[in-house]
Regions:
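Non-heme Fe(II) oxygenase catalytic core, chiefly the N-lobe of the double-stranded beta-helix
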Residues: 2-235, 243-252
Length: 252
């Protein structure tokens, strides 16, 4: 059975003695799922998994989704390719939760590092549950019944502004109209409350004249260093994060 060691941060755990290229047994799956819910992001080293292994692992946790804007592995549309260099720098450097422009965003994301830069390239994660816990009662009451709009168009505005960008992403725009999510959600496993907004995809609070100031406060609050952990990548490292309760961003 694999071992789980909590990080020194408010979230995250390292999982060792675990070979993700092999089929997980029922007890192993349950332990991993509980650990994901509890620690919010799990880190693995030296995982030599194939595309088939990657897809099989992800499928244990629910229905897989294909990203509408990024290239994917041939024959494996559920596996997104994230690749950047000097000619193709990353456009996504804001804190975000994956694909909240969907009515039902994915439960989590499983990212494996294959080509690691000599410097930079770390990933930061931030816990939205601990951030909620630290809100004062007035803010908790104020936010409880609010809804926010999450938008693909808002999140990919830089790509859409490029020459030919709107034509290239026309299908993604059509298939992903703006959606509404509660500002405060409850995690289905832990029961913890979560501040469910992110700077990349959340465009505004529905029907509230104070939308701008509320989001400004929330973004400043959830981006604080005390809620973060940092992961330094190595070849064949894996980060598996709970998309229901954390933000993440690359460090470039």
């Amino acid at each position: 059975m694999f071992e789980i060691e909590k990080t020194k941060y408010k979230l995250g755990a390292y999982v060792s003695n675990c070979d993700l290229s092999k089929q997980l047994g029922e007890k192993e799956f349950e332990l991993l799922y509980q650990a994901l819910s509890e620690y919010e992001v799990l880190f693995f080293r030296d995982q030599h998994i194939s595309h088939e292994d990657h897809r099989r692992l992800a499928s244990l946790f629910g229905e897989m989704q294909t990203h509408p804007a990024y290239p994917t592995v041939e024959g494996f549309p559920e596996i997104t390719i994230l690749e950047n260099d000097e000619q193709n720098p990353s456009k996504i450097e804001e804190w975000h939760t994956d694909m909240t422009f969907k009515r039902n965003p994915p439960l989590g994301s499983i990212l494996i590092g294959k080509i690691i830069p000599e410097t930079g390239g770390d990933t930061l994660f931030s816990t939205l549950s601990k951030a909620y816990d630290d809100l004062n009662d007035d803010w908790k009451i104020k936010l409880e019944n609010m809804n926010a709009i999450h938008s693909f168009e808002f999140g990919f505005k830089e790509s859409l502004a490029e020459e030919g960008g709107r034509e290239r992403l026309a299908q993604a725009l059509e298939e992903n109209p703006p959606v509404s999510h509660p500002v405060i959600k409850k995690h289905p496993v832990t029961g913890r409350k979560i501040i469910f907004v992110n700077k990349l995809f959340t465009s505004h609070i529905e029907g509230d004249d104070e939308s701008g100031s509320i989001l400004k406060f929330l973004f400043e609050h959830i981006h604080q260093d005390k809620y973060q952990c940092r992961f330094s990548w190595e070849n064949n490292s894996i980060a598996f994060w709970d998309n229901r309760s954390v933000l993440h961003k690359p460090v470039n």
